[in-house]
Amino acid sequence: MEATAKFDFMASGEDELSFRTGDILKILSNQEEWLKAELGSQEGYVPKNFIDIEFPEWFHEGLSRHQAENLLMGKDIGFFIIRASQSSPGDFSISVRHEDDVQHFKVMRDTKGNYFLWTEKFPSLNKLVDYYRTTSISKQKQVFLRDGTQDQGHRGNSLDRRSQGGPHPSGTVGEEIRPSVNRKLSDHLPLGPQQFHPHQQPSPQFTPGPQPPQQQRYLQHFHQDRRGGSLDINDGHCGLGSEVNATLMHRRHTDPVQLQAAGRVRWARALYDFEALEEDELGFRSGEVVEVLDSSNPSWWTGRLHNKLGLFPANYVAPMMR
């Protein structure tokens, strides 16, 4: 999600994010009065009443995979929602109504913070959704994203556009007063009975959730999943017959994590062509055998082919134990 800063905010805690009026923030999660956001290469928590944000109708962060399927099965082809990934905390999944079922795709992110499903990359989820409204999200069938907002003539409705602690109109029409910051619970000392004023609003009971573990660095700057086929393979069962089930079925029988328990993966055979779009990636053709140098990350491995070293997506290859 994208949000626009309405006021300057100076971070006072290590887990907070500073910004200036007019900055465009990338919202990563909704945490009541505080939101986790990204600006440039920095991440942190920001006060909700300092920013202007509209949550589209297709954004359902807390919905599970099963709930998404129940919701979308009663909709037309192309209806979708974006939700928090159950298998990868901090990431998103997109669930789309197809002809016979609901398909789930993991929204990938590269090292620059761009979002993508296939090879096209976008600076925000909003831009990704806009692109697949006119370009098929399916590689085998024509499936375009839709959520009913086209018929309404606007891009979704605001859900609680301003929190109760947000700015209120002043005596001048159209003027806003800079809001006070409702500090996080960890920023306050406990108040005794004699310290509480009957007209004073208590601080919101907010404590930042657990942070996803930082992944091992690869080639000095690799921190997270980057790109490639984006089926949410670890987020539950997907019906047979989908365009990405070849990868899914293969990983069910040759999951790299399971193979690592038996022994380190040293060689892998390419199942599909992979085109390297970044300098540190390793491209290959279907059928080629890649020497695996590091398979500790479940999503991207380090390998060598034709005397070239680089990263490649683990679900594009079949591990070989030899």
Curated annotation (Swiss-Prot):
List of residues that carry Phosphoserine: S186, S230
SH2 domain mapped to chain residues: 58-149
InterPro entries for the chain: GRAP2_C_SH3, Grb2-like, SH2, SH2_dom_sf, SH3-like_dom_sf, SH3_domain
Residue ranges, compositional bias (Low complexity): 193-204
Localization annotation: Nucleus; Cytoplasm; Endosome
SH3 domain ranges (all copies): 1-56, 263-322
Stretches the record annotates as Disordered: 143-216
Modified residues (Phosphothreonine): T254
Top-level lineage group: Eukaryota
Modified residue annotations for N6-acetyllysine: K106
Keyword Cytoplasm applies: yes
Phosphotyrosine PTM sites in chain numbering: Y45
Listed Basic and acidic residues bias regions: 148-163
UniProt entry keywords in alphabetical sequence: Acetylation, Cytoplasm, Endosome, Nucleus, Phosphoprotein, Repeat, SH2 domain, SH3 domain
GO cellular component: cytoplasm; cytosol; endosome; nucleoplasm; nucleus; plasma membrane
Keyword Transmembrane helix carried by entry: no
Job description of the protein: Interacts with SLP-76 to regulate NF-AT activation. Binds to tyrosine-phosphorylated shc.
Quaternary data: Interacts with phosphorylated LAT and LAX1 upon TCR activation. Interacts with SHB. Interacts with PTPN23. Interacts with phosphorylated LIME1 upon TCR activation.
Family: Belongs to the GRB2/sem-5/DRK family.
PANTHER family, alphabetized: PROTEIN ENHANCER OF SEVENLESS 2B
Record-given protein name: GRB2-related adaptor protein 2
Gene that produces this protein: Grap2
